[in-house]
């Protein structure tokens, strides 16, 4: 509160007084009164993000402010996606404090790796990321052997997997069964890829891989946050499919292309000190 204006502190005091279960206290500030608080109503989170980004862009232009003069506060980790996407769409540089950017979080990168592998089975990096996630008993030694054999043939790991019954890499029956299970899982997604629109395909992959069940199994605050992030990713895909200017059905490949554009490194070229803080 010592860094806040009197207007903000007075508003906070008004909220605190409403909590009758808390011991009464009065916070204060020695700073100037500051500008009045503005309350904006939005129909949904996408509109909220657009309003906030537009307000930042407008104020920066009218009052000759720096991006670093702005901060966006939100309550839960999953809420960062909508603000990040809104800022990116307006080419406003930002940095996330206390957390990773939404699309850089482990659980999101895991899900996107499944999406990419489904769309492009030659993506070895995505395959290596998810072949044993959620845990299915395929260890590093097995993966190293597959990768070495693929390198020897100058081909991809997926090609080796789909022809595993034609080669002898010294795997026991249990390991072969696990590898076949993974291969069949991805093939099943590939068979439905062009028959399903982006959201339905994404939800199918997240459900059938067991990612949601894995995140639900451990109710620590960190895992609850990860689960909420994956749900928020699905919300983003839903918005992507519903906010089209034409009647074309969007596929998972279309969504991945959109993600690539949104996470383009162009914004990273801006001065790291001159960014909106979120």
Q: Positions of the model-derived regions?
A:
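Conserved RecA-like helicase motor-core motifs
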Residues: 91-101
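Positions that flank functional sites
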Residues: 75, 101-102
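Phosphate/pyrophosphate-binding and catalytic-coupling "lid/hinge/switch" segments at subdomain interfaces
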Residues: 2, 101, 135-136
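Conserved helicase C-terminal RecA-like lobe
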Residues: 80-92, 105, 112-278
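Proline- and acidic/polar-enriched loop/turn elements at helix boundaries
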Residues: 28, 72, 98-99, 162, ...
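Helicase P-loop NTPase motor core
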Residues: 2-93, 116-120, 152, 176, ...
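Short secondary-structure transition/capping segments
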Residues: 9, 107-110
């Amino acid at each position: 509160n010592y860094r806040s204006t009197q207007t903000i502190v007075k508003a906070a005091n008004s909220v605190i007084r409403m909590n009758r279960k808390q011991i009464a206290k009065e916070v204060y500030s020695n700073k100037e009164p500051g500008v009045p608080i503005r309350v904006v109503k939005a129909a949904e989170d996408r509109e909220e993000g657009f309003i906030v980004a537009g307000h930042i862009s407008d104020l920066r232009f009218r009052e000759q402010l720096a991006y670093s003069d702005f901060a966006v506060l939100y309550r839960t980790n999953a809420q960062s996606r909508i603000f990040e996407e809104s800022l990116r769409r307006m080419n406003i540089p930002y940095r996330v404090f206390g957390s990773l950017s939404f699309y850089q979080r482990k659980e999101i990168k895991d899900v996107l790796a499944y999406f990419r592998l489904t769309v492009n089975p030659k993506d070895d990096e995505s395959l290596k990321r998810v072949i044993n996630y959620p845990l299915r008993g395929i260890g590093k030694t097995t993966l190293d052997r597959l990768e070495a054999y693929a390198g020897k043939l100058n081909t991809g790991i997926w090609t080796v997997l789909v022809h595993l019954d034609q080669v002898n890499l010294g795997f026991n029956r249990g390991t072969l069964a696990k590898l076949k299970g993974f291969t069949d899982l991805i093939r099943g997604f590939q068979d439905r890829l062009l028959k399903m629109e982006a959201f339905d395909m994404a939800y199918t992959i997240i459900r059938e891989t067991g990612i949601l069940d894995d995140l639900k199994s451990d109710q620590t605050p960190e895992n609850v946050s990860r689960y909420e992030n994956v749900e928020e990713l699905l919300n983003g895909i839903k918005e992507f499919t519903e906010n089209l200017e034409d009647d074309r059905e969007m596929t998972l490949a279309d969504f991945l292309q959109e993600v690539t554009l949104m996470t383009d490194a162009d914004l990273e070229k801006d001065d790291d000190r001159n960014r909106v803080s979120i």
